[in-house]
Amino acid sequence: MKPGIHPDYRPVLFHDTSADVFFLIGSTAETDKTHTHTDGKTYPYVTLDVSSASHPVYTGEQRKTKSEGRVAGFNKRFAGFVGGKGA
């Protein structure tokens, strides 16, 4: 590899601020901030808005937008008209 053109790969402390969870991961992310981790060492620090600790897809708290099909919704809406009094 050519020297001097690759970013430094080092441990970086990522903080998911919405879930208040820290991840210590090897990364090339650039930052001027530092933070002391629970192991007593100081690492470069990057804040995150969303991570696997807080995203609804990973936490299982996603909303069900469509719980039934279109036909079931139609039948539910017009159930009073079907099977009513015969002529």
UniProtKB/Swiss-Prot annotation:
GO terms for biological process: translation. GO terms for molecular function: structural constituent of ribosome. Keywords: Ribonucleoprotein, Ribosomal protein. One of its GO terms (cellular component) is ribosome. It comes from the Bacteria. PANTHER family: 50S RIBOSOMAL PROTEIN L31, CHLOROPLASTIC, LARGE RIBOSOMAL SUBUNIT PROTEIN BL31C. Belongs to the bacterial ribosomal protein bL31 family. Type B subfamily. Part of the 50S ribosomal subunit. HAMAP family: Ribosomal_bL31_2. This is Large ribosomal subunit protein bL31B. It comes from Pseudomonas paraeruginosa (strain DSM 24068 / PA7) (Pseudomonas aeruginosa (strain PA7)). The gene is rpmE2.
